[in-house]
Amino acid sequence: VAMAVIFGMIACVTFLTLEPVISNLLYPEEKPDAVIFPEEQEEISPEDMLVEDAPTPSIQEAVESVILEDEQIQKILDEIVLDKNNYAQLYNALYEYSTILSEYMVEVTAVSSNEDWLSDTYEKEGKTYGVVIANNGREYLILTDRNTVKQAGIIRVTFHDGVQAKAERKQSDVQTNLTVLSVSMDDISDEKKDDIKIATLGSSNFRQAAGTPVVAMGSPLGISGSMGYGMIASSGITLSKVDANYKIFATDITGSASGIGVLFNLQGQIVGIITTDRYSPDSKNMISAIGISELRKLIENMSNGKDAVYVGISGIDVTTEAHEEM
């Protein structure tokens, strides 16, 4: 009897130990789909949109056509009288557009446990914003700020319609201070899944960036759910990080030195990730962003759980004299 009991116990322990292995072999867990962002489309300038097969007019015809078009345009403009109502309509249109963009955004709440000087444990909450960038078939992937969530024990996200879900850190990058969070699709009801909108990554390789209208979403003013409208004022700025130089868009949007979020163009595409790195002491109250084209591959790798590998090279600007002496 004793031997039977011993053999029974051994069989039980063996079964409990091997059961997960056998289950995985018989019913392998479905792997998430690889996240691959579409290739960027080259920016097309207006002159490139002309039909190639159209007959080429003579120089005289072209000049007369341009003069006629200019006169017609000027006549139309002369007949338009703008007043404060038009100004209000413009801002109403921008606000309505921003409400559409807000459907891509989520509020991220990070809860961490800390101890005070009496060794009493208390919880601390931090809030930030993220943007839904992909769906790998099993998870919704959210790009957000790393600083807020890096030490959090619990992470919750609130979608635009109020639905809340637990999130996990999928991958982070120290250099750009970005984190990709994952939310299991099993935690979202089927009827609510249709309400979750996924943003599209655009391009920051503009032929002429300055003057491009943009909308800042997230918390660009340092206030949860704030927004800003404006344009790209300059793109000739470079932010040097380890193994990379990133294009910086300087905007004319007043914000906060701690502001975070994303820049959208008027086609609903992300063109930049707002950064707290400042290219000049005088720019601390102006929103700037890293161009999305430089971050596209990094975000794709993080969305697939891949680590960012760095050689450790940091570039600096040198004078012409120093360069010639090298």
Language model features with spans:
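N-terminal activation segment of mature serine protease catalytic domains
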Residues: M3, F7, T17-N135, I142, ...
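Terminal peptide-recognition signature
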Residues: T14, E103-V108, G130, Y140, ...
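Gly/Ser-enriched beta-turn/beta-hairpin loop segments
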Residues: W117-E123, S172-T176, D187-K192, S235-A250, ...
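Short glycine/Trp-rich loop-beta-loop segment that forms part of the substrate-binding cleft
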Residues: T200-S224
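C-terminal cap/linker of serine protease catalytic domains
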Residues: I270-M326
